[in-house]
Curated annotation (Swiss-Prot):
GO molecular function terms noted in the UniProt entry: adenylate kinase activity; ATP binding; zinc ion binding
EC number of this enzyme: 2.7.4.3
Record's protein name: Adenylate kinase
Catalysed reaction, written as an equation: AMP + ATP = 2 ADP
LID, as annotated region: 126-163
Positions with a binding annotation for ATP: G10, A11, G12, K13, G14, T15, R127, T136, Y137, Q199
Pfam families: ADK, ADK_lid
GO biological process, one term: AMP salvage
NMP: annotated segments: 30-59
Function: Catalyzes the reversible transfer of the terminal phosphate group between ATP and AMP. Plays an important role in cellular energy homeostasis and in adenine nucleotide metabolism.
Keyword Transferase: yes
Gene3D superfamilies documented for this protein: P-loop containing nucleotide triphosphate hydrolases
Length: 216
């Protein structure tokens, strides 16, 4: 199965992508992981991407597309993959179509995890991270035993600047503006299956599994 997993920031997409890839016995391909691998290995593409990242600029599509194509061309992708974080725009989706056609592959499903914005904001704004060990808590859903202190090491818990409400709202607005045309692109081809991401994690996992089964 060749699958794209979509979902807004805070939807638990990364976790579900790893679980789905494990269930299917196929690789989980995250663009974040690809970027880090190329940059840490100092590949020509990695060096080019690093120049943009270090300058605080958006990495151009041709660089991102080339990195993704390099990964999809590896033998373990022949029988399937779970793409996480790509494509983000219809332009990238068209580039992906060309890559897959060249490689003799085709998409089977686009799974969209849908979560109300209010819940995504609540999840992010309530998140707290330990300064010492990096453990993550939530003031409502997973609070520490002692407020402001890590259960594991006693370190101070803090709110990341990215988790402030204004910044979360900006990320969500950007996601929606990019994703609406992308979803339409795939809906016109009958590939999109939407699951509710505002349920317990196990139920979301089960619904994704059913969506994949229905796409075979």
């Amino acid at each position: 199965m060749h699958i794209i997993l979509m979902g807004p920031p805070g939807a638990g997409k990364g976790t579900q992508a790893v679980l789905l890839a494990g269930q299917e016995g196929i690789p989980h391909i995250s663009t974040g992981d690809i970027f880090r691998a190329h940059m840490s290995q100092g590949t020509p593409l990695g060096k080019l991407a690093k120049e943009y990242v270090d300058a605080g600029k958006y990495v151009p599509d041709d660089v991102t597309n080339a990195m993704v194509r390099d990964r999809l061309a590896q033998p373990d992708c022949k029988k399937g993959f779970v793409l996480d974080g790509y494509p983000r725009t219809p332009e990238q989706a068209r580039a992906l179509d060309e890559m897959l056609a060249e490689l003799g592959l085709a998409l089977d499903a686009v799974i969209n995890i849908d979560v109300p914005d209010e819940l995504l904001v609540e999840r992010a704004v309530g998140r707290r991270v330990c300064r010492s060990c990096g453990a993550t808590y939530h003031v409502r859903f997973n609070p520490p035993r002692e407020a402001g202190r890590c259960d594991r090491c006693g370190g101070e818990l803090y709110q990341r600047s990215d988790d402030q409400e204004e910044k979360v709202a900006v990320r969500l607005n950007l996601y929606h503006s990019q994703t609406a045309p992308l979803l339409q692109f795939y809906k016109e081809r009958g590939l999109v299956r939407t699951v509710r991401g505002d349920q317990p994690m196990d139920q979301v996992t089960a619904d994704i599994k059913e969506a994949v089964r229905a796409s075979r």
